[in-house]
Amino acid sequence: MTAEALGAVSAKWLAAGLSTVPADRAAAEDGVRLAYRSAGLRPPKHIVWFASPLAAARAAALLTGLSTVAPDGGVAFQLSSQGCPPVAGTAGPSVRAAVRTKPWAAARAEVHALLGPDGWAALWSACGADAWRMVNDRVAVPLRTHLRSELPAHARAVLLDAVGGQHDAGWLAAFDAVADAPAPAAEFPDYGAAVTGSGGSSGSGSGSGSGGGAALLAVQRLAGLAGVARAAGWWWPYADVAILTERPVELHRDNIGRLHAADAPAVRFRDGFGLHAWRGMPIPPDLVRRLSRLTHQEIASERNAELRRVMLEHFGYERYLREAGAHRVGEDECGVLWQLRFADDEPLTMVEVVNSTPEPDGTSRVYWLRVPPDTRTARGGVAWTFGLAEAEYRPLVET
């Protein structure tokens, strides 16, 4: 498979992993049944849907008999309305290991044997790593952490039963690439010798060579999981009940893929469950409401250093230095060095620089550069921004 084709597979799964369109419920339910059959299990008696992972986790806690979890009337009503008795024990035991863990491990072992260590590493780098980083690391992990905090301590065990659905995009992309079309030996060292056939997607691939056939059969056993991942969000597989969730209705990220929104949840589900984040860092909802009317006194009194940094970034470093009474450390031909100390964090240190080239209206623009806290001179700070030592910095023209 060419680099371009691998990129296309990765892009397809990245789009699925970040999708906010309504779930394709029929396709997802077909995927669930196929995943159970592929694991040698009968399909679940009930497939039920919830608007968010939080609601689904509460349903899982109720149906698995965690007696210490207080009954949730809303969850019970939704279960009843979908024909599933809201009774402890209805779900049966978790079948996650059979449906997800074992098939994944078997497929990985067979594909790794087919491609060899170098081929597997190259495949993962070309097709799985980017989707894994953008979807799992930057969306699923913070969402799971937040979800855990929203559940009572005694109910958090149900998160161990969850399958990522769309958030499994990273590793599904790599397996899908194996099924989609074999790569030439030049790209994956052991690929060409082992695979002589070609296949379709991970839902329907078939190989003509013995090595390729083995790999494709392993990937085919993931077809049900892939079907759910293309069509829905997180889900919980139990012997008698499968609990599925809708995808989020909103997902906001910054330019490098981190969850980020200044005035709304960075991830929001239809029932209101969501996660607020600033440049990848989860933040409390009440902070989002306060950001637009912050004062420098509030920032100074914030005891959480990480939240204080979020507040500073939104408030503006220049404004904060001016309003909070920063200490003027010194001035030289490169600018003015300012510093403001905190009791429990490194000092905020910045250089005020005046552009030597006037604007068209004759004014000179002022820039603020954040520099390391141990900076001693404005020249040293400006030099640091260019990756130079102070003695090496000799500007001829400033632009």
Residue ranges, per PLM feature:
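Short, glycine-biased loop/turn motifs at secondary-structure junctions and
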Residues: 1-203, 207-399
